[in-house]
Each structure stands twice: as C-alpha cells, then as structure tokens.
Amino acid sequence: PSLAPHLQAFMGEGGFVGAVVPPPATTLLNAPQYLTGRTLADAAARYIDEKLGGKANVVLLTHDSLEFLAPRFTAMRDVLLAMPGVVIVADISPVTVDKAGGFTTMNTILLANDSIDVVLGADTVVLGALEALRKAGKDRPDQFLGGIDGEPEAIAEIQKGGPYKVTVGLNSAVFGYALGQAGADWLEGKSVPQAIDILPMPISPATLAQYQADLADPAAAYADPSRRGAYLKMYGNICFDTRDRYVNFPWSSESH
C-alpha cells in the first residue's frame, strides 16, 4: 500500500515531510542527473584538451537501462561528441553494474582497442575497468578514468595519483543536514524550501580536502553560503499557512 495518503494527511495537519526523490513532501531533494554526467564529462574534456592534445579514445560504461540515470550518459555523449579529436570506441552497458561487470566489459573492449585514453561511468564499473587495464598492462598515468558516486575506493585511487583522476559525488552529510535544518525551521514556524537540488561535486586532488572537511562537519559547510551553494540549490518556499502547496509530483529541476 502507498504511504502517500498517510503523508498527505500528516502534512495537512501541519507535519513536515522531507524526502529524497519520491513525493509527496514538504521539502523534496533530488539530484540533477544530466548535470551530474555533464560535470564528469566536462572534467574529462578539459583533461583531453590540456593533457592529451585534444585527442582521445573514450569508453563509456553506461547504465541506460535505468531510465532515472540515463540523462547522465546523454550528457557525456553531448560533451564528447562535440570534440572533433575524440573517438568513442565503446558505448556499452556492462551486464552487471559492479566491479566484475566493468572488468569483464573492459577485457572485451581491449580485444578490439588496446589503446584507451578515457573511461567514464559509475565508480564501481570504472574501478573494474581499471583492474582490467592493469592486468593487461594497458594502464598509463596519463589516462583519465572518472566515475560517479564518490566511492571510497575511487577516492583512494585518486589519492594515489594514477589513471583515476576524478569522481563526482553528492555530499550526503551536507544534504542530510539541509533536510534536518528544514525540519527544524518548520517546527519553529519558518518558511522552508519546497525543493532542493543536490549538486554534483567533482572530487579530485584539488578539491578532496574541502569535500572531506565538509563531509565531517556539514553544519559548518551549511552555515557558509558559498560552500552551501556548491552543494545545494534551493527552489521555492512553503510554510505552515501554505502547507497545502506541497510537492506532489516527481520533481526535477531538469524537467522541461
């Protein structure tokens, strides 16, 4: 049975509901998927231009079967196909979206293309691809492997300074704090945002220390407008008197 009628009744009585993705909610959080993919692809494009002379053989390890995540890969294609020196040698969804899937898929790709410069996808599959490159002796320090999710193993690879250059993460501590703050503000009778974008953050050697500091102390990050603005974007407002105007549809800032 759906929780929605119970949540709607609770909100009608003045209660606060904070949700990540599914409605209904007083304050709804979501992550813009196209922007998430674009953030990773833009980092790769800069690297290709600055370090690889504008030329690269690229592998996209996708997850297009999950409609929710498909915009990530649309964004990657949009960025990379606009670069004349880039060849997408493989654009494929591993059978399983995990390290084993990435490892198996990359081994297959290497049979036809043994010189790979860039690999993009979810962290778990890209970590598997890195393992395949290493076992085949085809890993190079100047490669750009990049993922999405901010996985600890990906961050450890980035800290080593090898092929893994960036992971795009969502700062869970900061967005969790934001949702808690909205609930606290509501209890004090204040207006709260109707919707919040959880913005993708590229985690690289240059940004890692700040990201980890904000993960450890989300209150300080939230209190600093510029740091908060790097992680969150607020939309609309709702208060007790307008509580019937809650979000009751699958909201995304990228819906047109």
Name the predicted role of every residue range.
Residues 144-206:
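Flexible loop/turn connectors
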Residues 1-35, 57, 151-160, 164:
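Flexible loop/hinge segments that line or gate small-molecule binding clefts
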Residues 57-62, 77-99, 140:
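Short beta-strand elements in bilobed, periplasmic/extracellular small-molecule ligand-binding domains
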Residues 36-43, 67-87, 105, 128-132:
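Short, solvent-exposed amphipathic alpha-helices that sit
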Residues 11, 27-55, 71, 102-103, ...:
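Hydrophobic alpha-helical segments within soluble ligand-binding/sensing domains
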Residues 61, 68, 178-256:
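Hinge/cleft segment of the Venus flytrap/periplasmic-binding protein
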Residues 1-8, 59-60, 90, 113-123, ...:
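Periplasmic-binding protein-like
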Residues 75-76, 95-157, 180:
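Hydrophobic alpha-helical
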